[in-house]
Amino acid sequence: MLGEKPATLYSWKRRDRWDETEPVDRVALSMEAQLIRLVVKEKKEGRDFKEIDLLTRQLDRLRARPANDAKVSDSGSAVGSRRSRRADERNAFSDEQIEKLNDAFLESIFDYQRTWYRAGFKERIRNILKSRQIGATWYFAREALLDALNTGRNQIFLSASKAQAHVFRQYIVQFAKDAVDVELKGDPIVLPNGATLYFLGTNARTAQSYHGNLYFDEYFWVPRFQELRKVASGMAIHDQWRQTYFSTPSSLAHDAYPFWSGKLFNRGRPKDQHVSIDISHAALAAGRSCQDGQWRQIVTVEDAVRGGCNSGARPLFNLDRLRLEYSPEEYANLLLCQFIDDSLSVFPLTVLQPCMVDTWDVWDDFKPLYLRPFGDEEVWIGYDPSHTGDSAGCVVIAPPKCPGGTFRVLERFQWHGLDFEAQAAQIEALTRRYRVTYIGIDTTGIGQGVYQLVTKFFPAATPFHYSVEIKTALVMKAQNVIRKGRLEFDAGWNDLAASFMAIKKTITPSGLQVTYKASRSEEASHGDLAWACMHALANEPLEGATATNTGFMEIF
């Protein structure tokens, strides 16, 4: 109607304190505007002079009111002089900086992200199934910051773990710093206009008092999703709040799938109220408001390319190369938003979910930002070397402190394009960061070269030259540990979970034996991280630590 951007109107509203203006002040402003119009009128009539006199007297009377409202100035106009950022105010932005942020945001987003932006103005619930690495977390972090600055609404970021939720915070802090040189501080981040940005993991079950716009990241990888969604949606139950769910697909068996498919809406409702939602890519590629009140969209990597992410000086994706690097199954799951049928997996998602914990809450002895994150406690390293066309996987595991205790995956790494010398150098760097007492390495192929170099600085490294028997022993040990609830890793590490899910039972070429395999690619989550983890777990005997297979030596 006015031809102005929403961000400009929000800036006027905030600068002139429209929400703080009382009815009597609005009357004074209207009278002033009418008085100005009459004064500048060239040919005045008698009634114009009468109205000028009346308006002048009325404005004088309003000025004589008790000075309990400082919004009207001596001239009768509303206070609203342009405010500048106060140097002593934490996390403060001037109006000019907010406008610059808005411009930087709109100039940086792609067409498919612009679709999310438009949907955010009119849809209460956005539900997006997406390809990996298309900038969803990056986009929603920026969107939320601007919404908080423009409207004063709280923003709640919920992820499988607090570490994952803090990825939002990193994007927000970086955006403010790069665009307008404002350094945001605090956790949560509190803005001068009262808006608060919360970053939560699964401990949000105890945070029901929070309220604001909800952003739920990678919800298809969160354990006990239905339980958590009830709490999370309650934070945004007021009509002014919006809810945004976005994730890469996991398993058809995950309890978030009915929420995506619309089957959850039908539960407990009479049959005549049931809805049938078309969740095919053809139906949802452009975004669609569905019968259950959700706005859904599927964005594949090919949609992202069509949406402009390859239009810059540095294209994000080379689809031809990706089709070579990934198997058809991997390409469909990672990039075309197709769900995994893990019914044939040795490690289905339902078995892995109890292992996924919010490490920032439950591990108080691990400090990932320290030079020595685990102090002088011992760790084991498992390594799956890079073969032609795939990535190298490495995990650092804290072994149990007592027999039958829990293994904790402290860190996991993915290294691309490194030769065997560079891979060995990465392992050596870890031995300086941790007190390493065991290293297990696959010595098949290039792994032999890595192993030879590792033994120069860690002579006790254990080799695994793959055979049917060795693979079977590794998988059996991992199954035993996982099914007994003895493995923990960060709930935000869906790449590690997917890596285990990719391992399946198969038949050897001779048809005489059963073995295990996982597709290999440059994506760490498909096989290599799981095998690396199993190399470390194998340091404990299959039957566990017992009196007959453990001992100690005391030196006098």
Question: Regions from the language model: what does each represent?
Answer:
Residues 123-143:
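Walker A/P-loop
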Residues 176-185, 189-192, 223-318, 431-432, ...:
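ASCE P-loop NTPase helicase motor core
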Residues 64-80, 226, 346, 395, ...:
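C-terminal nuclease/phosphodiesterase catalytic domains that cleave nucleic-acid phosphodiester bonds
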Residues 152-172:
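Conserved Walker A/P-loop ATP-binding site and its immediately adjacent core
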Residues 166-212:
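Inter-Walker segment of RecA-like/P-loop motor cores
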Residues 191, 299, 364-365, 369-372, ...:
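Nucleic-acid-processing active sites and adjacent nucleic-acid-binding tracks
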Residues 11-14, 19-125, 196:
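Pre-P-loop entry segment of helicase/translocase ATPase cores
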Residues 288-383:
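ATPase catalytic-site recognition across NTP-hydrolyzing enzymes
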